[in-house]
Amino acid sequence: GDIDGVVQQSRLNDINPSDIADIQILKGAAAAAIWGTRAANGVIMITTKKGKKGLNIEFSSSLSLDYVNREFQKQDKFGQGVNGNWAANNALSWGDRIADRSGSDSFNTSGAKFVSEDGSVQYPITHKGDQTTYNQSNRDQVFRTGVTWNNNLSISSASEKGSVYFSASDWNQSGVLAGNSDYRRTTGRLNFDYNVNDNLKLSMKNTLAKVFSNRVQMGSNLNGLYLGYLRTPADFDNSDYLGTYYNAAGVGTMNSHRGYRNYLGSAAPTYNNPGWTLNKQVNTSDVTRFIVTPELQYKWLENSTFIARVGYDQSTDRRITYFPYRSAASTSTGSFGDNFITESELSMHLINQSTHKISDKISMDATLGYLYTDRNFFQIGGSAINFIITDQDRYGFFNSTNDNMTPFNSISRVLNDRYYGMFDFDYDDKIFLQLATAAEASSTFADRFWSPSASLSYEFTKDMKIPTLSYGKLRASWGRVGVAPPAYITGTNYVSAGSAS
């Protein structure tokens, strides 16, 4: 491929780690019993902090430095070429032995040339005699010391009537790649709860995150970083990657791209020069995310509590990709993409939790619940190729003609609801039985799906005193879970076909 190679980040990154109080992992059927088919592979439950008694103000600031501690070794014995002979623009590094060269290059200064941004000139080489190798300088073009500043402020307070927790954070990172490789996350959070009386409690959690990132193409990718970097011969200097190419008639082409597969920059090289990938190409993501979760807890019986929770999570993500004119492969004529994505999820969760003492040694915790979710996805954007203006960096659709633009959009909505029950039995605090069942319906499949599960565990170290074993448990479980299909896979799509003569 020539444009793949930028992996979008997990939205878990939107959470400030300093706000996290607890993380729990629920696996398999136990997770699906509560959270449904989306949790068939497990659930990560993250609990954020709440206020502490008194007035608490905390501030932290940290600086981290990142280094690449292991790299691929590159040979420096043989030059560019094949069969023991130096050859310009060749893909391989099986040329002549560098140490056996005469010590200086010969050039043709009467024809084409490449003038780099700093004024240095590259002429066609007629004889390769220079013994200089560039593995170290080429490496230094790619890697740098990564720098991360992490600042956190939190203010919290609590009393008998409730608590409040406020935080703000800023994570600012420049990566170890010496170019368009950076990440910045700014967050704010406000959590509070209020005890109306002994039986009624109100709470709300709010968070806002702003995340901007710019990432470098990677992988087996003609526009990627490592393909061109690792294949660069030891005797080729990657530093002058950008400049003006002049043909034999003296006509100049600005914004030309020079790499070891085209060392005069007369056309796009087969692989990008790493400097071009790092500094000219753009892959940005600009995310704004807002989450609000109000909750009501009402203790309506001595052993029963009713919980009503509503959650709304919305994020917008604008992604821009830019490959300048004379990038590698199919993007050699320029490519631009602008993609705007909005995702939202509305959830309503009704839960009743109760505790029952059956006998002196047997107790049961019962959870009955209903969960409704409404997920929406909207995407609109377009791509443009074959740039009109090629000697300058121009971002936007205005730099292509209409027939070189491709608009696109996508809309998706998925509704789910589920009823569930979970019953946990405890015998003498050593034998535990859990029985659960759920009935789920989704707009992506027709029939309501039942997912029963059961688990039995025995903490045998309560009865067997084993000096070398402080804790031991035997556990067996069974469950049936399913995964809902994606939206609209049973639909018949209309695609406008082109005409051919």
Question: Where do the model's predicted regions map?
Answer:
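Surface-exposed loop/interface segments of Gram-negative outer-membrane beta-barrel transport/assembly proteins
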Residues: 53-133, 176-184, 189-291, 307-417, ...
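Extended, hydrophobic alpha-helical segments in both membrane/secreted and soluble proteins
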Residues: 20, 188-190, 304, 348, ...
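Residues on the lipid-exposed face of transmembrane beta-strands in outer-membrane beta-barrel proteins
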Residues: 48, 147, 153-157, 190-194, ...
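N-terminal periplasmic accessory domains that precede
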Residues: 33, 39-61, 127-132, 153
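Short acidic/polar hinge/loop motifs at secondary-structure boundaries
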Residues: 1-27
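Transmembrane beta-strand segments that form the barrel wall of outer-membrane beta-barrel proteins
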Residues: 170-172, 433-445, 476-478
